[in-house]
């Protein structure tokens, strides 16, 4: 799909979905600074204020690339589309990427099980990196959680605490859920049956094999995640705090480069970073 482009050392052409959103703006800025990549297109929903305006307005410098409401044309102009929108939008863009034979990096969260299966099915035709968090630091934390869970085993209660800005629409965050999945897998548990999402009233004693989730929403918090291993007489906390969205954008571009030259397959950031 893009092996010829790579062999000729041409820059990787990037399309940004949801261009006027918080992540879209950061992705535009990161792409403009990225060596070996060019902003090929940027698109958003019809009626969005920035349609028809230069994508560079969102990052402070003119680019000559106008934000469009035509996703087909935008995706056709690129080698890879990066999408941090909403599940319904991402799935529509995925269908176009599959039809046009384009790679895709998906950072959207909040998918149902059936929607995740649709992404996996599309990956039989095109290469996809699908991950709840593209930041290198968060993915390092996933590995640390594997090690901690393996060492601590069943002797510690596990709680996942996450905080995000007031505008986030899904809870718990995809990153928090992935952290819970990592720990549950290492402990031989099924997160779907052992997860507890919030507590209220007279709950009784904590069941030993549960994994609890607590969600905070407020202000402009970019993203904080802590996994607490609470034992008798000691506690271990593994925390990641995001100060900006740039690590997500930089990781997404790294994922796009990883997909270059691949014809199909479903990958995550553990694959991109060689942590498998």
Swiss-Prot record:
**InterPro entries linked:** DapB_C, DapB_N, DapB_N_CS, DHDPR_bac, NAD(P)-bd_dom_sf
The answer on whether this UniProt entry bears the keyword NAD reads yes
Q: What does the sequence similarity comment in the record state about its family?
A: Belongs to the DapB family.
Q: Which GO biological process categories is it annotated with?
A: diaminopimelate biosynthetic process; lysine biosynthetic process via diaminopimelate
Signal peptide positions (record): none
Instruction: Give me the residues that bind NAD(+), please.
Output: 18-23, 44, 107-109, 131-134
Q: In which pathway does it act?
A: Amino-acid biosynthesis; L-lysine biosynthesis via DAP pathway; (S)-tetrahydrodipicolinate from L-aspartate: step 4/4
Q: Does the keyword Methyltransferase apply?
A: no
Q: What is this protein called?
A: 4-hydroxy-tetrahydrodipicolinate reductase
Subcellular locations according to the entry: Cytoplasm
Q: Which residues form the active site?
A: 164, 168
UniProt lineage = Bacteria, Pseudomonadati, Pseudomonadota, Betaproteobacteria, Rhodocyclales
UniProt-annotated binding residues for (S)-2,3,4,5-tetrahydrodipicolinate: 165, 174-175
Q: Enzyme class, one word?
A: oxidoreductase
Task: Report the SS bond pairs.
Answer: none
Top-level taxon in the UniProt lineage: Bacteria
Record keywords, A-Z: Amino-acid biosynthesis, Cytoplasm, Diaminopimelate biosynthesis, Lysine biosynthesis, NAD, NADP, Oxidoreductase
One MF term in the entry's GO annotations: NADP binding
**One cellular component term from this protein's GO annotations in UniProt:** cytosol
Main function: Catalyzes the conversion of 4-hydroxy-tetrahydrodipicolinate (HTPA) to tetrahydrodipicolinate.
- This protein's major location comes to cytoplasm
Species, as recorded: Aromatoleum aromaticum (strain DSM 19018 / LMG 30748 / EbN1) (Azoarcus sp. (strain EbN1))
């Amino acid at each position: 799909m893009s092996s010829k482009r790579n062999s000729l050392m041409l820059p990787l052409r990037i399309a940004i979905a949801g261009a006027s959103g918080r992540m879209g703006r950061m992705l535009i800025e990161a792409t403009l600074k990225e060596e070996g990549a060019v902003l090929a297109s940027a698109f958003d929903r019809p009626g969005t204020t920035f349609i028809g305006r230069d994508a560079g307005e969102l990052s402070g410098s003119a680019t000559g690339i106008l934000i469009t409401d035509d996703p087909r044309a935008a995706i056709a102009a690129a080698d890879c589309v990066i999408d941090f929108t909403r599940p319904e939008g991402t799935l529509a863009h995925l269908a176009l990427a599959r039809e046009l034979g384009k790679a895709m990096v998906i950072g959207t969260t909040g998918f149902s099980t059936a929607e995740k299966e649709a992404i996996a099915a599309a990956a039989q035709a095109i290469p996809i990196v699908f991950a709840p968090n593209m930041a290198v630091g968060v993915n390092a934390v996933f590995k640390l959680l594997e090690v901690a869970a393996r060492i601590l085993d069943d002797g510690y209660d596990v709680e996942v605490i996450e905080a995000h800005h007031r505008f986030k629409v899904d809870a718990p965050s995809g990153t928090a859920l992935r952290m819970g999945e990592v720990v549950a897998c290492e402990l031989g548990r099924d997160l779907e049956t052992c997860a507890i999402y919030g507590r209220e009233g007279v709950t009784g004693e904590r069941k030993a094999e549960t994994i609890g989730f607590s969600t905070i929403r407020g202000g402009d918090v970019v993203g904080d995640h802590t996994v607490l291993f609470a034992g008798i007489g000691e506690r271990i906390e593994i925390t990641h705090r995001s100060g900006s969205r740039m690590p997500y954008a930089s990781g997404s571009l790294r994922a796009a480069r990883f997909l270059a030259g691949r014809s199909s397959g479903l990958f995550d950031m553990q694959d991109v970073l060689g942590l498998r």
